């Protein structure tokens, strides 16, 4: 199971600037500062997987911050408790108290103003069944306005880590969870006069498509399709309690893609939230449903690194200069070779190439004789590394022509097609494979050359 990072929505007010530390291997120290009525400052000391220590800090130091040190790596934070409320000279609510709990059963001091341990304001608890906190996010200006956390689930494998952003919106309805996929191919959004009532997602997983449906389908719906090189970057939503309904539900959705395209459905009204994880793409949804979509959350995964384009190298054709020049181009590899012989040498060649999942047949070069053709077929995992051959000047043919060809792969050699006579040649480059052919031909094959790329795999 890959690591899944669960991002819990922050508690507190909406003032200050948003910040997000993302995730680390663990937390080593926490520093908290305060004034007479609120938490004004936090500082976190994280440890990365390679042991490097990273420090982040937010807010403003008024009084000397207090320190809480964990016995890293044997101890970690599993819960954060606190309070938030409105205070004098603050336009929105702010965090007034914090307590950190650890896997060793320890508690930090009660940070923030209090009277003999008594606190005021709205209490909150952030925990997830003893799971480890590996990062923080929130809002701050001259104080700590809001605080949220990342929990880690699962164990690290070769699979890339996935971020699960908690569902936001209403609290009613049935819980649903599509899980994470390779990507989202298309989505359909249904609505009535005041709510998002239906969601249909078409996901991709291992080259196959899977469709998940939620809510109640309506006549009014909008389909939004993504291009193969496009992904959903973020979802902005509003939620409210429409007048004629008793539940808080999602009222609008705006999907934004990596190409800058957007798709809007619904009616904006109520509170707003955004599902987004910087530098990552959306790969799945979860939420709550009833007669409408009550709440919505999402999964985010790393953006795949594009496969670098490997420049192809064209090796000059060897042989005579007669006939017309030809060039099959560049492919992923060679699948089949057809060679036709004439009375004095090679009269005809044709190549079948691999391009992605497709087979592409090259043009005929030369002229097929009554002797027909012989073929050399490559197996899965086999690729061409070189060509050996001979060319010579033949009576009745104006310029030299190819007399014989023999093909070498990473596994074997073909039988020679033709006779060993004339000038010998070899085409190929160490550490490269052949991905295309070119040359010159008339009624016979006068010359042949190859295009090669570095060997990166055997497919």
Curated annotation (Swiss-Prot):
Keywords: Lectin, Repeat. Residues 5-153, 162-302, 312-454 form the Jacalin-type lectin domain. Disulfide bonds: none annotated. The keyword Secreted does not apply. It holds the Pfam family Jacalin. Disruption phenotype: Smaller PYK10 complexes. The keyword rRNA-binding does not apply. SUPFAM superfamilies: Mannose-binding lectins. Transmembrane segments: none annotated. InterPro entries: Jacalin-like_lectin_dom, Jacalin-like_lectin_dom_plant, Jacalin-like_lectin_dom_sf. Polymerizer-type lectin that may facilitate the correct polymerization and activation of BGLU23/PYK10 upon tissue damage. Belongs to the jacalin lectin family. This is Jacalin-related lectin 23. It comes from Arabidopsis thaliana. The gene is JAL23.
């Amino acid at each position: 199971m890959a690591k899944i990072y669960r991002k819990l929505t922050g508690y507190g007010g909406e003032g200050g600037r948003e910040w997000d530390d993302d995730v680390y291997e663990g937390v080593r120290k926490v520093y908290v500062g305060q004034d007479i009525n609120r938490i004004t400052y936090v500082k976190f000391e994280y440890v990365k997987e390679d042991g490097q220590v990273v420090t982040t800090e937010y807010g403003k130091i008024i009084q000397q911050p207090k320190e809480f040190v964990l016995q890293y790596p044997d101890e970690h934070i599993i819960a954060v408790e606190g309070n938030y409320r409105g205070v004098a000279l603050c336009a929105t609510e702010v965090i007034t108290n914090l307590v950190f709990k650890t896997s060793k059963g320890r508690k930090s001091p009660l940070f923030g103003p209090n009277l003999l341990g008594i606190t005021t304001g709205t209490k909150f608890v952030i925990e997830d069944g003893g799971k480890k906190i590996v990062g923080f996010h929130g809002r701050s200006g001259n104080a700590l306005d809001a605080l949220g956390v990342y929990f880690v689930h699962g164990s690290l494998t070769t699979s890339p880590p996935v971020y699960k952003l908690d569902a936001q919106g209403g609290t009613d309805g049935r819980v649903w969870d599509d899980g994470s996929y390779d990507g989202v191919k298309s989505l359909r959004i249904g609505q009535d006069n005041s709510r998002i009532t239906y969601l249909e997602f078409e996901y991709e997983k291992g080259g196959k498509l899977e469709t998940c449906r939620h809510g109640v389908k309506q006549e009014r719906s909008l389909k939004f399709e993504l291009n193969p090189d496009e992904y959903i970057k973020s979802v902005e939503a509003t939620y409210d309690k429409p007048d004629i309904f008793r539940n808080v539900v999602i009222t609008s959705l705006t999907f934004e893609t990596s190409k800058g395209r957007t798709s809007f459905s619904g009616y904006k009204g109520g509170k707003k939230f955004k599902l987004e994880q910087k530098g990552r793409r959306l790969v799945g949804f979860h939420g709550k449903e009833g007669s409408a979509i009550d709440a919505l959350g999402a999964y985010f995964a790393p953006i795949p690194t594009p496969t670098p384009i490997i420049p192809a190298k064209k090796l000059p054709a060897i042989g005579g200069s007669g006939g017309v020049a030809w060039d099959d181009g560049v492919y992923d590899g060679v699948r089949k070779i057809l060679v036709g012989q004439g009375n004095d040498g090679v009269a005809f060649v044709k190549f079948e190439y691999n391009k992605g999942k497709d087979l592409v047949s090259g043009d005929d070069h030369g002229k097929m004789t009554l002797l027909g053709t012989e073929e050399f077929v490559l197996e899965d995992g086999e690729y061409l590394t070189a060509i050996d051959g001979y060319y010579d000047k033949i009576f009745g043919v104006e310029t030299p022509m190819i007399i014989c060809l023999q093909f070498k792969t990473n596994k074997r050699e073909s039988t020679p097609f033709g006779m060993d006579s004339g000038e010998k040649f070899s085409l190929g480059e160490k550490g490269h494979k052949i991905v295309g052919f070119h040359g010159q031909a008339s009624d016979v094959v006068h010359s042949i050359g190859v295009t090669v790329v570095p060997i990166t795999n055997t497919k």
